[in-house]
Design a protein with these regions (language model features):
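A general structural motif
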Residues: 2, 27, 54, 91-92
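Short, glycine-rich nucleotide/cofactor-binding loops
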Residues: 3-16, 34-40
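Short internal beta-strands
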Residues: 29-34, 55-63
Length: 98
């Protein structure tokens, strides 16, 4: 069964993103939200790309925009807040990294 990983913190401040990558499986999904959006510019992002296929990598667009983060839509998919709620409700298992 796949897991939804909600990453709310920056790897520049905590080890939560590294811990997430240590346990992630190939069929899991990662969503960057809140300060987790900063992980797009962290070295660990390349590790995330090597473990998870693009269709399962998301960022909450409103949270990235609020932090003036440029989104390369070839490297990550965007979610609206409504789409995030739909994804959470449709997923049986999730963990929040915060």
């Amino acid at each position: 069964m796949s897991m939804l990983h909600l990453v709310r913190t920056s790897a520049f401040q905590t080890s939560d993103f590294q811990q997430c990558l240590n346990v992630i499986q190939a069929n899991d999904t990662i969503v960057l939200l809140d300060d987790g959006c900063y992980n797009l510019s962290h070295d660990l992002w390349q590790q995330a790309l090597s473990k998870i296929a693009l269709p399962a990598l998301y960022i909450v667009e409103a949270h990235a925009q609020a932090r003036a983060i440029t989104i390369d839509k070839e490297k990550i998919n965007t979610l609206s807040l409504d789409a995030l709620m739909t994804l959470i409700c449709a997923t049986e298992k999730s963990v929040t990294w915060q």
